[in-house]
């Protein structure tokens, strides 16, 4: 007999998100985690000296800022379970080799003032670029945290308007195409290209251009944040929410396989041999390359397409340091200390940077290393003992080395990490033996070992962010709706799934799909709540009184504005805009109108409509 409604493989932040929604709706959930901590890619641990709290993977929370999980506090993480974000006025900064610095402030005017000191032309272009991206956000963001449409259907919709075709164009271009079109100065180009490449995408990779537009727009609209106490505090608040609603998390519990019978997922078997059954569903936090390992009965074409999902061209080398005192930057620009994302740029030109990106693709270790990092205790003293400091650095590196393959990382880990430390010393004056208490290096191979079922070949975002692996085709068209064809009641979550890797809260979309399949009403279960997020928006209450008809989604975000309803021949023609800016014309013929009337005009619905006509907004 099943003891749980839903069983989840893994307790990463995506599994926690999905199970949090299910648990709040009354489902009894069990999460089985192979580690002795929850969070997966959003985890904070004392890995070296007691009192120093390091983020194991993700550190910066960007895409999740617009998620109703946060903006509407749908799981009461802020209200009840201790979640709290710190926002910085400086989402991103770059220190260059000459110790000059360029800041992306959340304030667009202030950002442009700084850029104007380098290039007035580029500062003006940057303002227009951000405004273009912000005009697209209403088209993109409302659907980001729901099940995604098929790629072909989205393209057909975009191709129906001029604004949509602009988006299509950017989606298919490379970041470098877009950066070169808009900007001229190498420092500004490198500043933007380096920030966008944190998504593990090469600047000249076709099909990644839209990320460049969205990334800059998001920083100036929603900002960039870190949880107080570390990235893992998000996961810890989710654990408390699940346990408070009757859910259970078991640690040091590794799943061997998903139990399938009659084409339906029934439960799981642990590596200990224990079997646990689920009444309603099983959630698998697994990479598409790993489905064959865990699930029997999946058709060979589906498996082969899953195993052909493309990975990022490079991975990360991560360094953690416990310091006696906070880091001291060599640059005179003090605002870099506020930056949540801080790039240390050794390259003198965009051409030099591009050559080293090309080398990464070939599996080469570059002489000038890509580095980013910061002392997170400068803005969050809870991360370290009083008066101490820390250094958390990431840098791009290939998983499969041209010389020696991935296994060579075990041989060169310390030497490579020490060279990275030496190069970072060009920017930080006290990253040395006098100040370092302890350190730990994670190679791309170590990242895979830490999360073998999600971060294959060290791809911390699951799969590459390419155009053909976007929206409902991420990671493949078969799997883009969080389901595995031919296996009922099995749902997939994790960084490989839509809309993107990183801390997005993508498990919300998976939960919406599960609610529908289980006959549950997601919309009525999760109403808008109060939140400590700075990004809470209620579109309905802010809509102008301009005579237009507006349609809103379940989170009170505007979906469509109807500007006019006319007749043409024997059709009703509805004109307006979707998501605030995209023109839309819809035509209803006689048959469509009869069917609509039949849907709307039952006696009960008719009386409701009459009452609505005489009610106040």
Label each PLM-derived region with a short phrase:
Residues 185-202, 366-374, 430-498:
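A glycine-rich dinucleotide-binding beta-alpha-beta segment and adjacent secondary-structure elements
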Residues 326-327, 361-366, 409-449:
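Flavin-binding catalytic cores
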Residues 2-138:
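N-terminal glycine-rich phosphate/pyrophosphate-binding loop and immediately adjacent elements
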Residues 216-265:
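Helical element adjacent to the flavin cofactor pocket in flavoenzyme catalytic cores
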Residues 260, 516-540:
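Active-site-proximal substrate-binding core of FAD-dependent oxidoreductases
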Residues 256-383:
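Mid-domain catalytic core of redox enzymes
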Residues 97-206:
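Rossmann-like flavin
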Residues 495-515:
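A conserved FAD-binding loop/helix module that cradles the flavin
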């Amino acid at each position: 007999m099943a003891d749980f409604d839903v069983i989840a493989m893994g307790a990463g932040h995506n599994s926690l998100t999905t199970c949090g929604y299910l648990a709040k709706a009354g489902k009894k959930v069990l999460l089985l985690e192979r580690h002795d901590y929850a969070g997966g890619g959003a985890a904070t641990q004392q890995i070296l000296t007691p009192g120093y709290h390091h983020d194991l993977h993700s550190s910066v929370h960007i895409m999740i800022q617009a998620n109703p999980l946060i903006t509407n506090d749908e799981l009461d993480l802020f209200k009840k379970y201790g979640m709290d974000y710190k926002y910085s006025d400086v989402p991103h900064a770059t220190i260059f080799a000459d110790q000059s610095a360029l800041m992306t402030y959340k304030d667009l005017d202030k950002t442009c003032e700084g850029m104007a000191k380098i290039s007035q032309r580029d500062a003006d272009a940057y303002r227009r670029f951000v405004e273009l991206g912000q005009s697209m956000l209403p088209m993109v963001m409302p659907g980001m945290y729901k099940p995604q449409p098929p790629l072909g259907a989205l393209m057909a919709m975009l191709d129906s308007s001029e604004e949509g075709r602009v988006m299509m164009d950017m989606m298919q271009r490379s970041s470098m195409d877009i950066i070169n079109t808009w900007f001229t100065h190498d420092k500004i180009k490198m500043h933007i290209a380096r920030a966008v490449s944190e998504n593990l995408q090469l600047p000249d990779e076709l099909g990644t251009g839209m990320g460049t537009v969205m990334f800059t727009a998001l920083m100036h609209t929603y900002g960039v944040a870190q949880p107080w106490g570390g990235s893992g505090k998000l996961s810890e608040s989710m654990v408390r929410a699940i346990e408070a609603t009757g859910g259970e998390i078991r640690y040091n519990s590794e799943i061997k396989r998903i139990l399938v019978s009659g084409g339906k997922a029934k439960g799981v078997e642990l590596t200990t041999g224990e079997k646990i059954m689920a009444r309603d569903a099983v959630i698998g936090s697994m990479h598409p390359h790993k489905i064959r390992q865990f699930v029997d009965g999946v058709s060979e074409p589906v498996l082969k397409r899953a195993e052909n999902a493309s990975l990022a061209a490079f991975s990360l080398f991560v360094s953690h340091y416990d310091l006696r005192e906070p880091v001291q930057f060599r640059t005179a620009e003090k605002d870099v200390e506020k930056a949540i994302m801080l790039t240390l740029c050794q390259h003198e030109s965009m051409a030099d940077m591009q050559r080293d990106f090309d080398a990464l693709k070939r599996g080469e270790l570059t002489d000038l290393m890509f580095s980013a990092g910061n002392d997170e205790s400068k803005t969050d003293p809870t991360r370290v003992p009083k008066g101490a400091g820390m250094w958390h650095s990431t840098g791009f590196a290939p998983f499969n080395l041209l010389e020696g393959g991935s296994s060579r990382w075990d041989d060169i880990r310390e030497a490579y990490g020490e060279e990275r430390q030496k190069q970072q010393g060009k920017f930080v004056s006290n990253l040395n033996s006098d100040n370092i208490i302890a350190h730990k290096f994670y190679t791309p191979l170590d990242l895979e070992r830490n999360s073998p079922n999600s971060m294959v070949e060290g791809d911390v975002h699951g799969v590459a962010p390419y155009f053909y692996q976007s929206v409902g085709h991420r990671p493949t068209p078969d799997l883009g709706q969080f389901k595995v064809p031919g296996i009922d009641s099995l749902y997939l979550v994790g960084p490989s799934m839509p809309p993107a890797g990183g801390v997005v809260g993508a498990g919300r979309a998976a939960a919406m799909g599960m609610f529908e399949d289980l006959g549950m009403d997601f919309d009525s279960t999760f109403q808008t709540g109060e939140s400590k997020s700075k990004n809470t928006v209620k579109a309905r209450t802010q809509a102008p009184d301009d005579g237009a008809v507006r349609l809103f989604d379940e989170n009170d975000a505007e979906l469509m504005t109807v500007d006019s309803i006319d007749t043409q021949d024997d059709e009703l023609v509805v004109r307006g805009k979707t998501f605030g800016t995209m023109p839309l014309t819809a035509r209803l013929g006689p048959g469509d109108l009869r069917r609509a009337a039949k849907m709307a005009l039952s006696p009960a619905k008719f009386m409701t409509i009459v009452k609505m006509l005489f009610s106040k907004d």
